[in-house]
């Protein structure tokens, strides 16, 4: 077939060197290579970008306005492309309304199921709600007191956008005189103009009555008319009282509580009809967190117990005046530890004295005096200032003392009581979503046989769709998640696999899928399931391209493309392409070296014993952790492992890192639940090294992040030419006026908006991309301008600045972590996650080590090739050799086998996790039968021991 291949000719995007490549269609293809070799440039920035661009360009210009505009990649030609879908790790929603259920669309099916099959109950008495007859409605109204005025309303429109002219005209034609719109009364003979883009509620006034004898017949007729107009709903608006809602469909005869209509939107927490009115469907409020204001209750006010903006203790301050007044009233001094103060005193300090006044003494330059005033409380004060301020800085400052607290009305369930009273199998929609996916599948299997024939007929197809999607999530190792889990709390790997299941559920064929390391965050045990899922996607008739470093995934692929041979300027070529055997045979392929065994990451011959001290987390209870005590040996390379969802991130990121950051670094983050951490006296600081960008603007680069650019600017300012002109280091900054080119403000490029076409970036015509003005560029050091230096690779700069020890030392660390190919001025936004992390590592290596630092890394091998992992391990071992402690969350067995100590959590994910399954050296963990990590580690250690015995 002519169309069974994707043919790429002359790809030059980023560092690609005029690449020509032919890929088979409808196959499972892995693209691999060193970090920075150009594989993402080929997969995402060339193949996906062109497939997506062509599809978008086929749409109208109006439609293109609402879609992401993509640049045309730098490539001569690509043939055989299909519409492309990219599933990367960067698109996790941070919208608090976005959950696993909404992202996977399972929640939409659940809303449909509960609307059609759910059994409504009274939220007060729990009685099953049944239909009301007109007689029952009349009886309820006749219970009103004699003389009570009321009107019968027909709600023809409920919370719907539009001008509603059709309904208003129909009411006029039917002879009605009045209508109630959004709570306001209107005469129908006047012109009524409603805002088109706002939701409205329109209620026709059917009749106006006063309670007296003999109105039963008229009331029944009016109610029947209202029911006919609305399809079964009527309201009785009691003047000066509460409105009574009646339904021919569902209502509690005892409490009169009725549900107007069991529609899917009633079960949506994003719709005012069903969302909890207090929290508007968020389930939480942002409130000032008293734990952040009083993080250490062992301290007194004078010692700085209060950590709140405007309330830090200082002698002679207004804060001190209030503290002394509170102390006099509630019996404490400024030297009383918070934990020894009465509950009443602490409550007054935080939440105020209500109407009670306190005595305060104020002394200033005009004299002294006694004042009596109420105290609003630190919490109330901060919340009021947060509401009233227009300053973004102040909002951010006070916001750092706030955290989400559960809504007191819905208790975090997001929906109204009447909605939560609708159940299937005894569980409401929120209860179902709070179960793990594993438990949800069991619940469906247990309850499906109990449904009536009618329920099965209505909900059978819906339940099938829900089951399929839940099983897809289970198949990619996510059965520990709940549908209620906020999408913003998911890791990159989790969110990517969730979107992957959505695509499988859509069952498209003839599509090109491009995925970015889907194995991230996945334990080896679940990797086989993921590979089967990717093959399933291929078998539907799709082409699946995966950027991946995982050995099992490579060995399962139909076709492998190895990009290299090195990284950056040393990469950008196709080193090898074909089957696993072809890659292993390729002489220039570093991937082939590791797959064939020509190179390998060796197990250390000895394990460090540590320095004898420990950091001990007592009673860890965050998320699914089950009140466990965990000991971290100091002075060792510690690896925390376990099945996805077993509690690793809760233990390390939420408890250990946040507690250490608060205690040692003065951070304000709220740590996860535990009884405390022992051994803090043995460490002096904690450093978290993640894969977040080193800067979010093109102005950030490796030179500015590591601080080496300050030293370079100083060197330029000390040249004879600079001294003669009076140029200081600031002259050589591209961020401030003076030395930079003002035409492009030091960017070197200009952005030209093209509206319906992608924005065009062109080199600045004035400085020709050099960033600086002509006068600044006349100053040279060793015949090079400051712009020339920014364009140097780290390798070149190490040689160039060899006689500048301070600069050379910082540059050498960048070289040590494998970033020799990166230019000093390379924009931070173009660095991969792995590269950004290694820049941070280099920055830490360049510092003078105290030997008492704890380094915490979460899956540092993400985005790293086997050769990069090898180099990363060497860097981490250097940090530990200096006496520091490195704690790593990891699934990569090559890194795990090199650790001194392993803490394995499990045994499963979610509610079945949260325990320590095994701990000790890799050899000790490998012998624990219940440890999944140990099961995969054992053959690896045995293989290494065998090769070592053979002298290989």
Language-model regions: role of each:
Residues 1-952:
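Conserved phosphate-binding elements of NTP-dependent enzyme cores
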């Amino acid at each position: 077939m002519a169309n069974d291949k994707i043919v790429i000719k002359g790809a030059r995007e980023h560092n690609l060197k005029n690449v020509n490549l032919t890929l088979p269609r409808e196959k499972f293809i892995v693209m691999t290579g060193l970090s920075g070799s150009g594989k993402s440039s080929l997969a995402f920035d060339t193949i996906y970008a062109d497939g997506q661009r062509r599809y978008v360009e086929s749409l109208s210009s109006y439609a293109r306005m609402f879609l992401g505009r993509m640049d045309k990649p730098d490539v001569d030609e690509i043939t055989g492309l299909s519409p492309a879908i990219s599933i990367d790790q960067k698109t996790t929603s941070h919208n608090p309304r976005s959950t696993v259920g909404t992202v996977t669309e399972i929640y939409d099916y659940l809303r449909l199921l509960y609307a059609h099959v759910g059994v409504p109950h009274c939220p007060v008495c729990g009685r099953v709600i049944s239909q009301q007859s007109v007689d029952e409605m009349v009886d309820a109204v006749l219970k009103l007191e004699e003389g009570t005025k009321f009107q019968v309303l027909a709600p023809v429109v409920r919370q719907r956008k539009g001008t509603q002219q059709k309904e208003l005209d129909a009411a006029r034609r039917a002879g009605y005189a009045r209508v109630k719109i959004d709570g306001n009364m209107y005469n129908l003979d006047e012109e009524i103009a409603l805002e088109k883009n706002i939701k409205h509620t329109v209620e026709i006034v059917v009749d106006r009555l006063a309670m007296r004898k003999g109105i039963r017949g008229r009331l029944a007729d009016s109610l029947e008319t209202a029911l006919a107009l609305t399809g079964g709903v009527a309201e009785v608006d009691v003047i000066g009282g509460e409105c009574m809602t009646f339904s021919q469909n569902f209502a509690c005869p005892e409490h009169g509580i009725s549900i107007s209509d069991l529609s899917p939107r009633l079960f949506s927490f994003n719709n005012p009809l069903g969302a909890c009115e207090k929290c508007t469907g968020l389930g939480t409020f942002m409130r000032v967190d008293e734990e952040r204001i009083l993080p250490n209750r062992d301290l007194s006010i004078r010692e700085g117990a209060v950590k709140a903006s405007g309330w830090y203790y200082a002698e002679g301050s207004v804060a001190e005046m209030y503290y002394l007044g509170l102390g006099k009233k509630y019996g404490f001094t400024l030297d009383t530890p918070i934990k020894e103060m009465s509950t009443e005193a602490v409550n007054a300090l935080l939440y105020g004295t209500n109407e009670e006044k306190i005595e305060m003494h104020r002394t200033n330059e005009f004299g002294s005096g006694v004042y009596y005033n109420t105290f609003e409380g630190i919490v109330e004060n901060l919340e009021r200032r947060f509401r009233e301020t227009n300053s973004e800085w102040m909002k951010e400052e006070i916001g750092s003392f706030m955290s989400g607290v559960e809504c007191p009305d819905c208790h975090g369930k997001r929906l109204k009581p009447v909605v939560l009273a609708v159940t299937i199998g005894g569980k409401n929609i929120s209860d179902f979503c709070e179960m793990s996916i594993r438990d949800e599948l069991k619940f469906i299997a247990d309850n499906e046989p109990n449904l009536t024939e009618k329920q099965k007929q209505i909900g059978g197809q819906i339940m099938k769709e829900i089951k399929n999607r839940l099983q897809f999530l289970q198949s990619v190792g996510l059965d520990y998640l709940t549908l209620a889990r906020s999408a913003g709390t998911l890791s990159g790997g989790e969110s990517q696999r969730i979107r992957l299941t959505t695509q499988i559920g859509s069952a498209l064929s003839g599509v090109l899928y491009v995925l970015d390391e889907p194995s991230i965050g996945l334990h080896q045990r679940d990797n086989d399931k993921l590979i089967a899922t990717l093959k399933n996607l291929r078998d539907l008739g799709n082409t699946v391209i995966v950027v991946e470093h995982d050995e099992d995934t490579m060995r399962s692929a139909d076709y492998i493309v190895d990009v290299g041979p090195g990284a950056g300027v040393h990469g950008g070529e196709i080193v090898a392409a074909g089957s696993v055997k072809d890659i292993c045979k390729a002489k220039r392929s570093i991937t082939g070296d590791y797959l064939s065994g020509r190179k390998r990451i060796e197990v250390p011959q000895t394990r460090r014993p540590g320095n004898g001290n420990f950091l001990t987390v007592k009673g860890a209870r965050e998320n699914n952790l089950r009140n466990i005590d965990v000991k971290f040996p100091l002075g060792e390379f510690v690896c925390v492992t376990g099945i996805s969802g077993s509690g690793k991130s809760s233990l390390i990121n939420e408890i250990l890192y946040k507690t250490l950051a608060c205690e040692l670094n003065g951070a304000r983050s709220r740590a996860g639940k535990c009884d405390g951490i022992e051994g803090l006296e043995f460490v002096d600081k904690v450093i978290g090294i993640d894969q977040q960008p080193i800067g979010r603007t093109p102005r950030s680069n490796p030179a500015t992040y590591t601080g080496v650019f300050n030293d370079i600017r100083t060197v330029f300012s000390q040249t004879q030419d600079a001294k003669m002109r009076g140029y200081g280091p600031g002259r050589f900054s591209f961020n401030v006026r003076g030395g930079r080119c003002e035409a492009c403000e030091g960017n070197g490029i200009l952005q030209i908006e093209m509206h319906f076409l992608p924005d065009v970036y062109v080199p600045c015509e004035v400085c020709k991309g050099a960033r600086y003005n002509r006068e600044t560029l006349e100053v040279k050091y060793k015949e090079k301008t400051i712009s020339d230096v920014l364009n140097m690779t780290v390798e070149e700069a190490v040689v160039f600045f060899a006689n500048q020890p301070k600069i050379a030392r910082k540059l050498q660390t960048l070289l040590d972590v494998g970033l020799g190919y990166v230019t000093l001025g390379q924009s931070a936004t173009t660095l991969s996650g792995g590269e950004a992390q290694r820049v941070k590592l280099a920055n830490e290596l360049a510092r003078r080590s105290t030997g008492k630092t704890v380094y915490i890394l979460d899956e540092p091998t993400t985005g790293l090739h086997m050769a990069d992992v090898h180099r990363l391990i060497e860097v981490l071992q250097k940090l530990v050799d200096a006496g520091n402690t490195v704690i790593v969350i990891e699934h990569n067995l090559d890194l795990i086998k090199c650790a001194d100590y392993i803490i394995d959590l499990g045994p499963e994910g979610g509610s079945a996790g949260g325990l320590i399954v095994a701990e000790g050296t890799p050899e000790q963990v490998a012998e624990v039968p219940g440890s999944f990590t140990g099961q995969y580690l054992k053959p690896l250690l045995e293989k290494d021991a065998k090769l070592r015995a053979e002298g290989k």
